[in-house]
């Protein structure tokens, strides 16, 4: 607890002093501070982590002056929180990103760590998500040029970050976008044809030692008489493993009068899939297809999305694993819930073979006489199957979610919401019911409470920490005093198998751009998701301090 207190005082001091320094010369300084620290306490029902304290910290500073900008980000893991072990072994403080950029009317160039995305990210996306412990920025150079409003061309080259270190892999790519609507002077529509190329290169000499073991294959006597040694790269290449993997993408974007149509197809060359099979050198080509059709009119909107993936997991380093080991973006195309029980067992993308999609509908009915009264209706359906058929010629179900929610603003003081979700994820089926009510006492004070119930259909004789473990009940009570204070208590109780309470309580204080949150509770093992990408988090009990500030 002493380390937790000292850290809070230090970061609060930095936040206060930094917020006063916004102008430097003719330029502008901006930045942010984020700290997430947990002191793990003993718990008879949950094993306490070996290290009783963890802290993930980030400090980012940017400077801009006219067309010039630059920035850095420092990360400190003191040590890393449980579940983020890939980020650091023990204590680590390092420069995680830096950049210098020049931007003109039609031209820009950036040297440093690149965060970018081609199209929908199926072929390439570099980004940071601290909740997932994810940062695959590209250290190198990126340049872009706009030929008026008609053509945009950009290219990049660099080495990607793999957790706290840079990989020995090299990535290069180019992206082209042509606006046919502007060329045809059709101002009423959006019509773009786009394409991308991405190459990942890793020297075969960087392959792990087990691939260098010629005893794995008696016929692997590839001997170099000049050096008197085995030629390991040639040996590895004899299994079909190549240093280069290429991805090609074609895209179409169309929009007119509330209608949007988007499509993308990606072809991926032969890639090595670590851990997919015991056979050394398992290589496979891949492809992805994505289609979206949406329409909105006044208070009504509908969006239908389809996607198929076949061997599209594209690792930064094909010989390693982990959520952060990826150069492309393959999120789950399912509804992302914020309610506890609805998000108990989220869908995990099967990048090497899935087929499915989702449909999302929204409608809002507003009172013509009272702006404080309205109805919001929302329905969503998503389903995914294995790409390849089974022995009976049918595709096995991976996921299905049918859900509907209704929100009602009754007057200035009362608002309520009801949600129902049916989820089927191969291992079990669940019916989830949620009630959410908010009462505003005045302009500042409000009280919100939730009640949730999960009715499970899984086999109660077999369960583990990653399944629903039978029925669940949950509740939350939150009291807010805007714009500064918020207090909450919540509990999630398993009434089907473990009979365990997962309780949590805390408060937050916000002042200008600084927010401090302190909480204590027991957290269930499971997946934490952000933007459709999930990371496994082990169970723990502890005191959690979060500080965020920007200037």
Where are these regions (language model features)?
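Bacterial Sec-dependent N-terminal signal peptides
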Residues: 1-30, 551
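Well-ordered mid-protein domain cores that form the structural environment of catalytic cofactors
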Residues: 100, 105-122, 126-147
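Signature for the C-terminal beta-barrel architecture of outer-membrane proteins
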Residues: 22-28, 37-54, 64, 69-70, ...
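Phosphate/ribose-recognition catalytic cores of enzymes acting on nucleotide-derived substrates
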Residues: 97
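Active-site beta-strand termini and strand-to-loop segments that position acidic
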Residues: 102-104, 254, 509
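One-face residue pattern on beta-strands with alternating periodicity enriched for small/polar residues
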Residues: 32, 58, 142, 504-508, ...
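In a subset of proteins, long, contiguous C-terminal domains/tails are tracked
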Residues: 2-5, 12-13, 509-551
């Amino acid at each position: 607890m002493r380390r937790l207190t000292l850290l809070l005082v230090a970061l609060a001091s930095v936040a206060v002093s930094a917020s006063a320094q916004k102008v430097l010369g003719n330029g502008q300084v901006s930045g942010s501070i984020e700290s997430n620290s947990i002191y793990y306490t003993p718990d008879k029902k949950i094993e306490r982590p070996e290290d009783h304290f963890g802290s993930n910290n980030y400090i980012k500073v940017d400077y801009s002056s006219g067309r010039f900008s630059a920035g850095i980000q420092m990360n400190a893991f003191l040590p890393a929180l449980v579940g983020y072990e890939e980020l650091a072994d023990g204590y680590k403080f390092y420069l995680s990103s830096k950049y210098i950029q020049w931007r003109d009317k039609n031209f820009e160039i950036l040297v440093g760590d690149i965060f970018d995305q081609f199209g929908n990210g199926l072929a390439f996306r570099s980004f940071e998500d601290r909740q997932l412990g994810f940062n695959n920025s590209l250290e190198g150079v990126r340049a872009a040029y706009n030929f008026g409003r008609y053509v945009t061309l950009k290219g990049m080259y660099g080495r990607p970050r793999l957790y706290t270190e840079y990989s020995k892999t090299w990535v290069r790519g180019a992206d082209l976008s042509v606006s046919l609507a502007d060329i045809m002077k059709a101002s009423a529509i959006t019509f773009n044809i786009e394409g991308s190329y991405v190459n990942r290169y890793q020297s075969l000499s960087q392959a792990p030692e087990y691939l260098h073991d010629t005893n794995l294959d008696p016929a692997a006597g590839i001997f170099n008489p000049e050096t008197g040694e085995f030629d390991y790269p040639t040996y590895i290449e004899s299994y079909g493993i190549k240093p280069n993997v290429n991805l090609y993408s074609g895209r179409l974007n169309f929009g007119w009068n509330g209608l949007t149509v988007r499509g993308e197809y990606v072809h991926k060359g032969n890639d090595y899939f670590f851990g997919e099979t015991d056979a050394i050198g398992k290589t496979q080509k891949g492809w992805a297809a994505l289609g979206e059709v949406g329409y909105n009119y006044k208070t009504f909107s509908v969006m239908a999305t389809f996607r198929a993936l076949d061997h599209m997991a594209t690792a930064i380093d094909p010989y390693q694993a982990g959520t952060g080991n990826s150069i492309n973006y393959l999120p789950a195309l399912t509804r992302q819930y914020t309610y506890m029980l609805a998000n108990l067992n989220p869908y995990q993308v099967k990048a090497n073979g899935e087929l499915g999609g989702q449909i999302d509908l929204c409608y809002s009915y507003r009172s013509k006489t009272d702006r404080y009264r309205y109805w919001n209706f929302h329905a969503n359906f998503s389903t995914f199957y294995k790409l390849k058929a089974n022995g009976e010629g049918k595709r096995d179900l991976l996921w299905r979610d049918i859900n509907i929610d209704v929100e009602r603003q009754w007057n200035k003081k009362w608002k309520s919401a009801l949600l129902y979700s049916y989820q089927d994820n191969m291992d079990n089926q669940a019916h989830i019911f949620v009630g959410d009510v908010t009462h505003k006492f005045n302009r500042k004070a409000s009280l919100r409470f939730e009640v949730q119930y999960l009715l499970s259909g899984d086999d109660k004789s077999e369960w583990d920490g990653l399944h629903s473990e039978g029925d669940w009940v949950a509740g939350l009570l939150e009291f807010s005093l805007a714009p500064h204070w918020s207090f909450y208590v919540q509990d999630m109780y398993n009434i089907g198998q473990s009979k365990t309470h997962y309780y949590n309580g805390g408060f937050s204080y916000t002042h200008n751009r600084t927010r401090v949150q302190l909480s204590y509770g027991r957290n269930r093992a499971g997946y934490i998701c952000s933007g459709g990408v999930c990371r496994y988090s082990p169970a723990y009990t502890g005191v959690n301090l979060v500080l965020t500030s920007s200037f």
